[in-house]
Amino acid sequence: YSGLRNPAVQNGFGHTPCVGILSGYFNKLRRKNRISIDQAVAGMLGNETRFRSLVFQAGENLDFSQIAWDKHGLPVHQIDSPRKIFNLLFQVNENEQTQQQILAEDRSILDAVFRQAKSMEKRLNATDRAKIDEYLTSVREVEQTVKRRAYWSDRSKPQVAYDLEGFDRKSVDDYVGALLDLAVLALQTDSTRAVTVQIPFW
């Protein structure tokens, strides 16, 4: 194995090197090759599920509590509320029922942006073309996200025999236990195939 050694943890930075626990990468100023292993797994297994990946965070969202990084080296959104997670996975939001029109509008906007960028590309020098290529790559990724949302927007969410009645966020056992329960349910219902649960400290 290679790339698993992280010398930064030997330099007395306390909890700060935790940002690289899933990526083996500590320098927050450089983003190249900083994808975390959970997101690499999501890239391979997450194309057939409602959620490509899910990242749960227990407790306060501190600078060094971010451990999931996308292929651009950017932090992946973390959810810290069990109720929000439950609703995301299993509850139908009334707003979701009207999202087909919104998604169609999003696709139209992306098509227009893509056409405009491609028309500009021919008039640019090599450096600017490289930047446009990066921009178009980002546009394509957003387009894939929109298509994914459109595909799942008219498909029913799974039903589970689980509720959060009596849940007390102030109880460490309740809080962490609920996050772990929801992680298991997300996998059991095949809502995702990549779940990361971050439990910093209390």
Task: Please provide the spans of the model-predicted regions.
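Ligand-binding pockets and gating/stacking loops
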Residues: Y1-W202
